[in-house]
């Protein structure tokens, strides 16, 4: 019988098979295949990294929350109409502006794992489970934890990633006596075998243990024990692919230089024909094509929006698993799950075809979206450019 430590037995987590998928290629984890982003693809975002590094805890978290749009009632807050307007020469999906606005309102009514234990939430959530408040987390440690959480998340559900992060955090506190929990210095004291044991439930855990320790050593030797602040420096780290790099850059440094395309964004944008599935064989190709037309003002939030929908239509997911990470006084822990489940079923039934999804959102009168947005189209007619979307869509979302 396999020996399970107290850290790896905190929850019963299914071990994911080592499989290679089109939308989550195993090659993203290989350090030999490095991706260099062309300079012309980068969207300028004025962020003074030295200034960010100088921010104390309170000011840093206040700034990064606003910068990433992770504010209360984010999805229920109407967008500035100008954000959704695109040039007349840009082809956009059928009824995109109206549908996107309604999607945001519907998104405000559902709770998904990404909302509790997503890339930027997981360090704070895990720390609170270990008695470390947000006020006690240094910005440098937070940035490290964002990076490590993103590295662990590849081909792994958020709930499983959160448990692996919790294992590391508790080991750093209990065994290494690190009062701050998961710091660079503490992680470097963990040997590879032990780290592999702590993260055994995530996909490719043995490989990730090696990459994490190698990455931490590089951060110590080459980046003054902090996370790199450019896309190509992040892509130079072992096991870090474009999705991980863009997400880390956004969540840790507030730099929006590209869209983070994970399996959910990849599948839904192909399903709805927001991108050409025949030309987008990898998530990075999906990212490039999506960036060609999606208004830049939406690059920050598109991942969180679609990931939330993608997670709740995954039939194999037990959404109740995420509640264990909520503190008892969190109002989200007392949600009416009967109503949530009914809403999830409606979404599952209607999201599989974009024309059907549009009609579903148009019929949801209780969403009260009349004040959400009033966009003047610069296109001649949106319907003419995407008339093919009226046909049945053959792409199906896998579990």
UniProtKB/Swiss-Prot annotation:
Residue positions of motif Bipartite nuclear localization signal: 14-37
One family name in Pfam for this protein: HHH
Phenotype upon loss of function: Greatly increases spontaneous and hydrogen peroxide-induced mutation frequency. Causes mitochondrial genome instability. Suppresses mitochondrial point mutation rates, frameshifts and recombination rates, probably because NTG1 can generate mutagenic intermediates in yeast mitochondrial DNA.
Record-level GO BP terms: base-excision repair; base-excision repair, AP site formation; cellular response to oxidative stress; DNA repair; nucleotide-excision repair; positive regulation of mitochondrial DNA replication
Site residues (Important for catalytic activity), renumbered to this chain: 262
Span of chain positions assigned to the transit peptide in the UniProt entry: 1-26
Enzyme Commission code(s) on record: 3.2.2.-, 4.2.99.18
Chain ranges of the HhH domain: 223-247
Active site (catalytic residues): 243 (nucleophile)
Family: Belongs to the Nth/MutY family.
Function comment: Bifunctional DNA N-glycosylase with associated apurinic/apyrimidinic (AP) lyase function that catalyzes the first step in base excision repair (BER), the primary repair pathway for the repair of oxidative DNA damage. The DNA N-glycosylase activity releases the damaged DNA base from DNA by cleaving the N-glycosidic bond, leaving an AP site. The AP-lyase activity cleaves the phosphodiester bond 3' to the AP site by a beta-elimination.
Protein name: Endonuclease III homolog 1
